[in-house]
Amino acid sequence: MASHAAVVEIIDDDDDDDDDVAAASTPPALHKRSHAVAAAAPDSPDAFSPSPPDPKRRQLAASTIVLDDTPTPPKRRPPPVAADRSASVVADTPRSFVPCSLRNRAIAGDTPDSVLPSPSFHLDAPDSATPGSDVPCSVGLDDIVPETPGFNSPRLARPPAVPGLTSPMTARKFSGVSCPISLDSDDELDDTVYRESLTRTPSNMAKPEHAIQPCTTSCTDKVENTKSTDKKDYSKSNVGYQTNNSACKNNGTTSYNQPPRANSPCEDSTLKEADPFINNHCPQEENALPIEERKKKQQEEKRLKKEKKAREIEEKKQKRLETKKQKEAMKAELAELKKLEKEKKKWESGKLATKCIVAEIDSSVIESGSVGGHLVQGFHEKGLCFRVTSNSIKGSILWKMQIPNEFTQDQASTSQVPYILFVLQAEEFCDLVSGGTLLDHVQKVRRQYPEFTICYVTNKLMSFIKRREQNQYNKTTSNSNSWKRPPVEEALCKLATHYARVRSRHCTDEAEVTEHIVGLTYSLANCKFRKPLTWLSVHANGSNISKGCVDKDRIKKSAWLKSLVAIPGVSPGQAIAIEKKYPSMRSLLNVYMDDSKSVHEKEHLLEDLRLEGPLGDFKRRLGPACSKKVYTILMAQNGAAEVEVDRRGA
């Protein structure tokens, strides 16, 4: 299908010019765009000769013609080059647009006589910058170099850009198009070359000028620039003007200014379809964020991290404080428990008993007589607690123990001591005895306090009786109202014989009364925690040893001697005689438990032991009575049995 387009007529020069160019052309792999019949052979020395000076050519006018843009099948001829050298060519179609991929390969300029530099031949000389010719350069991914017809440039003798492609068929196979489009006449089909894809091979990567640079500029701008060139008028005859050799650098890729070329709408659509960068935004533009926004985001992240770190530090601090408080609380609780345990032990041992007992004194005791002042002073001096109250029975004193709450285990916090004391003046006691109401008084107290011990304390009783008797004796005449001595001794004996747990105490003055009551308070406080006394505990410390004994200290140091002395009827001398024969209780018990001996022999076992006299003689014997006592006590089955020794034997 033919279409009208503004194109440039390409007029070939004489063959002489082509011959001149052929002399400086590259090896046969690079076909010159001319009507020359033959080129220099690969092995010819002219193939690598330096380029001749640029020929002077006149400018030719071009006119607008109508071209058929239907592609014509190109003529393919075998390349006159060895199989190991592949030709790197550039499409020779003037004013044509070859769609290519901007991502995968670069587009070289459609210059008729230009070739791409080859990495196989290293010519470090700078490229020719002759006016009117295209100087080969490294073409970037985004560069589209238009072709300037009518001008030939000396070709550089360099190998193909992509080694490994040995034929135009292979080059076309790896190119991005199915077939190059030629807008020239039929006789120029012989000079049609094929575009090879600039793939990334090790040979291409060797030279930096053949490296394909990535697209760093906006692809949309290039498409817009390409569209803007369509509006230019190419009908002018001065199309093939001479360009200045000004190198432009585009992201590391060097290209030379070429005349602008318009793209048709179909070419623009083809370019958009072939180029993915036009349809999609560049990744760098898509991922790029404004600097201020990134800074704000970074600052926000830093602030959040800082707040998180501060929050974690604060949480750790709070945890440490809570742990510290818990440890302090546990430590304080343990200290309190230890203190409580210590106080409990003190309480159980009776060390705190005097601080817990309270004496309840009837007000009549404090108000009447001279005992009250001394009694209050005595309690204050000893640090004892007392309380003046009005008791149910006049003149009585009661005691109570205030047990601490932490020591009580299902017990009342206050316990009453089962003891009641009556402080009676001598005249009061004599009136009770004379009137016969003393025993009635005892019965009354017993009914109210049945389990209590009753004690009567009198003050100056005997002195009062003597004074009254003396006064009665000094009277001259007998009076019917004369005072008679009350039977005090008989009343006190009845209290001791007829009633249990009834005591009496006669004091000579107020100081003795105070001392007795204070001492009784101490005893009542500690008696609850005191071990009960037994016969053995009373005599175990050697209290029954006579004062005139010479070996008293020796007996107190030996438990075996103190045990022997505690037996009734065993003197210290007899105990020492037994200890000399049998130094321990076990040695004596072994003999007593011997079954081979009879009971009679065991009873008389110790009777022949000799006692040491005052002068050191051993004339006296222990005797059968003492021997039987020792045997009876040590071999008794009942510990409460009394020792009653029969002199006649067992």
Curated annotation (Swiss-Prot):
It is an enzyme of class 3 (hydrolase). Residues 221-235, 291-326 have a biased composition (Basic and acidic residues). Residues 391-592 form the ERCC4 domain. One of its GO terms (cellular component) is nucleus. Keywords: Calcium, Cell cycle, Cell division, Coiled coil, DNA damage, DNA recombination, DNA repair, Endonuclease, Hydrolase, Magnesium, Meiosis, Metal-binding, Mitosis, Nuclease, Nucleus. Its cofactor is Mg(2+); Ca(2+). Residues 1-94, 107-168, 220-326 are annotated as: Disordered. Pfam families: EME1-MUS81_C, ERCC4. Residues 238-261 have a biased composition (Polar residues). One of its GO terms (molecular function) is metal ion binding. Residues 36-49, 82-92 have a biased composition (Low complexity). InterPro entries: EME1/EME2_C, ERCC4_domain, Mms4/EME1/EME2, XPF_nuclease_EME1_plant/arthr. Interacts with MUS81 to form a DNA structure-specific endonuclease with substrate preference for branched DNA structures with a 5'-end at the branch nick. Typical substrates include 3'-flap structures, D-loops, replication forks, nicked Holliday junctions and also intact Holliday junctions with a reduced efficiency. May be required in mitosis for the processing of stalled or collapsed replication fork intermediates. Plays a role in DNA repair and in genotoxic stress-induced homologous recombination (HR) in somatic cells. Belongs to the EME1/MMS4 family. This is Crossover junction endonuclease EME1. It comes from Oryza sativa subsp. japonica (Rice). The lineage of its organism: Eukaryota, Viridiplantae, Streptophyta, Embryophyta, Tracheophyta.
